[in-house]
Amino acid sequence: MGQPMRQEHDSIGGVDVPAAALWGAQTQRSLNNFAIGHQKIPAELIHALARIKQCCAAVNGRHGLLNDQQVALIERAGQAIQTGQQDDHFPLSVWQTGSGTQTNMNVNEVISNLAAQESGENLGSHRPLHPNDHINRSQSTNDVFPAAIHVAAALQLQQELLPELKRLIASLDAKAVAWQDIIKIGRTHLQDAVPLRLGDEVSAWRDRLSDGAHWLTTAHQDLLALPLGGTAVGSGLNTPDRFAHEVCAELASRTGSDFQPADNLFAVMAGHDSLVQTMAQLRRLAVTLLTIANDIRLLACGPRAGLGELLLPANEPGSSIMPGKVNPTQCEAMAMVCTQVIGMDAAVAAAGAGGHLQMNVYKPLIGYNLIEGIRLLQDACRCFRLNLLTGMEADRDRIAFYVERSLMLVTALTPEIGYEKACAIAQHAHRDGLTLREAAMQSGAITDERFDQLIDPAAMASPHR
């Protein structure tokens, strides 16, 4: 026996739909025609669309375009969708029409059928709510779908990624403060350089992430300008007066975010520059996180035959063949996430440039990568903080050993004896296996007392403190 089916109709004709499905004919056609990959439209985008449907219904009701019962039914169905309990009824692939029309209709159809269930009507009857005439009233996919991407990404940034990023920054700040007394050897070109404080090295990571958070916050502000009310091309055809302002005000009231209609609806519908900019800032953050992860795993390499300056928590066995091996797995996971996000940015940039005239037809791709990129970075930052940074320690003895053996401390002698003599001392020490002090004394270029005054790693690490 096959799956029970019901038949629904749209402007093309009849189509068989699973009997228990809350979606309708247009969603089913998309499932039939676009069986491509496994990437689905993100739930955050579906929930944002449902929220927008609620706001549009409320404004349409105030303008007399929907009655109180219709508004209430859309309100309740939209709320049910936002709980996530209906997520299985949004099965569409990212790889569909470039406008997102089929996902917009998926939401309209599910709301229609939820209302039918509540009202004792048959699924697919379009009673008491028609997907187009009532639920999509005063709307076009061309304005509500990109608006939903804006809303979903803005709320994700505000509620998830930025707070987690702040916690990560605070964790690094605690390490920077705790390790201010540790003097270590700096490294440039992966070679020994002059000393610095371990706390200062960590503070560089912290402040680079703080800059990233600042620019993400700026991008978040750009996302608050919505294309809602532009309908098909930006003119607002088939909307009541001030619809754009009233819908955005309704959305702002419900979310606590200052959503506004964009100054030029034609511009934000023809192009998605704010979304491209936000993705670019995610890439910037990914670049910073990737360099931090790489720095940490380099400083932690060992434990016996590497730098070993940082000690990482042993979260899990590292090898199926080498007993006792522990790997920097959180750094590796972070590096993979960041590499993925950098690739996502390239896709979004190309998609943003791919629009023609009044419409960009890469909307699902842009929305998917942006929302997924935010989610990946938020999850990676949380895991990195909890499973690596919290338990990361400094090997003070190993760090001090490297400082004592470093030849680059000779840099402090340069103002006193000149570059060439200082270079000769360092080369002599390295060639003959001497300490820097021994080579300096043999050179006769500086006295023992003056050497001790100049070669002070703590003073070299903080020359102006």
UniProtKB/Swiss-Prot annotation:
EC number per UniProt: 4.2.1.2
InterPro entries associated with the record: Fum_hydII (IPR005677), Fumarase/histidase_N (IPR024083), Fumarase_C_C (IPR018951), Fumarate_lyase_CS (IPR020557), Fumarate_lyase_fam (IPR000362), Fumarate_lyase_N (IPR022761), L-Aspartase-like (IPR008948)
Listed pathway(s): Carbohydrate metabolism; tricarboxylic acid cycle; (S)-malate from fumarate: step 1/1
Keyword Cytoplasm: yes
SUPFAM superfamilies for this protein: L-aspartase-like
Function: Involved in the TCA cycle. Catalyzes the stereospecific interconversion of fumarate to L-malate.
Name by which UniProt lists this protein: Fumarate hydratase class II
GO cellular component: cytoplasm
Quaternary structure annotation from Swiss-Prot or TrEMBL: Homotetramer.
Protein localization: Cytoplasm
Ligand binding (substrate): 99-101, 127, 130-133, 140-142, 188, 320, 325-327
